[in-house]
Amino acid sequence: MRIMGLDVGSKTVGVAISDPLGFTAQGLEIIQINEEQGQFGFDRVKELVDTYKVERFVVGLPKNMNNTSGPRVEASQAYGAKLEEFFGLPVDYQDERLTTVAAERMLIEQADISRNKRKKVIDKLAAQLILQNYLDRKF
């Protein structure tokens, strides 16, 4: 069963996919969106869902450090609800506190990637970390 992990922002969605057995996550790509104009990237998500035969989504919840919910949590939950309605697949949520920080640290310390290049891959890596945390929690 393949699971798709999503790191939802207001302008981009980082996408990751699990292996068929659900043990590991791999970052795929970053989809450009525009929340204000109602463009959620679902055409591209559908292509990926069909290609990888996705059966479930995991959306990151960017909670505050004190475990409270802010406007981005609400936006992520709204995106998840739209996914569920559009695709008819179950949506789970995963706490994503510090995943972007961890992703950036990995890119700086382990890969020594420049700031400009980091911006191009950070959301994809964050989605991978969100999905991997979810998979680790399940097994």
UniProtKB/Swiss-Prot annotation:
One of its GO terms (cellular component) is cytoplasm. Its main location: cytoplasm. One of its GO terms (biological process) is rRNA 5'-end processing. Gene3D superfamilies: YqgF/RNase H-like domain. It holds the Pfam family RuvX. It is found in: Cytoplasm. It is an enzyme of class 3 (hydrolase). InterPro entries: RNaseH-like_sf, YqgF, YqgF/RNaseH-like_dom, YqgF/RNaseH-like_dom_sf. GO terms for molecular function: nuclease activity. It comes from the Bacteria. Keywords: Cytoplasm, Hydrolase, Nuclease, Ribosome biogenesis. The keyword Cytoplasm applies. Its EC number is 3.1.-.-. Disruption phenotype: Probably essential, it cannot be disrupted. Belongs to the YqgF nuclease family. NCBIfam families: RNAse_H_YqgF (TIGR00250). Could be a nuclease involved in processing of the 5'-end of pre-16S rRNA. This is Putative pre-16S rRNA nuclease. It comes from Streptococcus pneumoniae (strain ATCC BAA-255 / R6).
